[in-house]
């Protein structure tokens, strides 16, 4: 089944409400559309955008429970290699009400602790347990990926910021925080690229 993407329509919709919630809703608006493919043995598997929306919601409910109501609005680091669950991991954190700090998945325990302290973060979603201050909440990604379905009536509360850091190899690394409006502005910049080369997206 052929799918088309209305770049102009989506861009205009995003301009109407430049929030992470609206960006997520627009991204997942064609729920039946394939979003990602991977191989399990010889079998081709896929997630649709509807699948990713639901997984994001499931992860959000799990993270809200693990990280706590009182920590909503604060930063939580994501320290995870690229994988098929990365999309719902990121959006699940945002939908749970926590701002996302993106960290290099290969940082040492010492540098991970340093970056968490610099960002005022309350925890980290990680592929391995770190030897860091016990005051930080550590959520293992393998546990998150097994999260049960979100309970009926669970309502996401979207956060509004994403933080990136320069190479975390020295103690002088810097953290840059992007409010949701700035994130949406960056997304809208892709419209200019599409105008220059329409083959980027099948329109």
Locate the predicted segments by residue.
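Conserved AMP-binding A3 loop
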Residues: 46-49, 161-188
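Adenylate-forming
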Residues: 26-27, 52, 56, 76, ...
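Conserved structural elements of the adenylate-forming
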Residues: 55-59, 176-199
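A general structural motif
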Residues: 33, 71-73, 121, 157-161, ...
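Conserved AMP-binding/adenylate-forming core of the ANL superfamily
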Residues: 12, 35-68, 77, 81-83, ...
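A short N-terminal helical cap/helix-turn-helix that marks the beginning
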Residues: 12-36, 161
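Conserved AMP-binding/adenylate-forming
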Residues: 45, 62-106, 203
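Structural core segment of the AMP-binding/adenylate-forming
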Residues: 91, 95-156
